[in-house]
Amino acid sequence: MTKQIKGILGEKLGMTQVWDENNRVVPVTVVKAGPNVVTQVRTNDVDGYESVQIAFGEIDPRKVNKPLKGHFAKADVTPRRHLVEIRTAAASEYTLGQEITAEAFESGVKVDVTAKSKGKGFAGVMKRHNFKGGKASHGAHRVHRMPGSIGGCATPGRVFKGMRMAGRMGNERVTTQNLTVHAVDAEKGLLLIKGAVPGPNGGLVLVRTAAKGA
């Protein structure tokens, strides 16, 4: 069953700290949320499921291909850089061209934040997968940070898929669940989210109603 999910695209500005009502320091991530526009509404009757497509970020119209130009023209909005579709049971409450701002969320609600994590480059198994590594002394010969065995020899004669090994780390889609919206600045379009959010400053983030939260 699809829940009533709210969502908004925005830009991560960075972290700071604020005081709460009990005079305790709270670390927060500041997200410049929206404004987004609704570019498509999917319904059960036509599409077999309910969702809403939102767009964010200005883009030069000359850089948009013809199919997307027609898609934006149908919604009567200017072309945008980023598009995302959110499954929600409340899709019928949205209309084409409707603007979505930070006011869609209230302080205290739980949210899931999705973004591309920071790229770390090529990393070994100790950094990438938290391996213990080899012995630091007592006969260890240049195996201190090696992964150890990666499988059998003639049987199975190959390395199984999913084997944790050294490789490119980060720069992948990550979702941090059940973060709390500490405060909303509707005038400036800011969301103050308690704790850390994936990705670098200036990165694109998607803030949605928590899938597992209360």
Curated annotation (Swiss-Prot):
GO terms for molecular function: rRNA binding; structural constituent of ribosome. PROSITE patterns: RIBOSOMAL_L3 (PS00474). GO terms for biological process: translation. GO terms for cellular component: cytosolic large ribosomal subunit. It holds the Pfam family Ribosomal_L3. Keywords: Ribonucleoprotein, Ribosomal protein, RNA-binding, rRNA-binding. Part of the 50S ribosomal subunit. Forms a cluster with proteins L14 and L19. Belongs to the universal ribosomal protein uL3 family. One of the primary rRNA binding proteins, it binds directly near the 3'-end of the 23S rRNA, where it nucleates assembly of the 50S subunit. This is Large ribosomal subunit protein uL3. The gene is rplC.
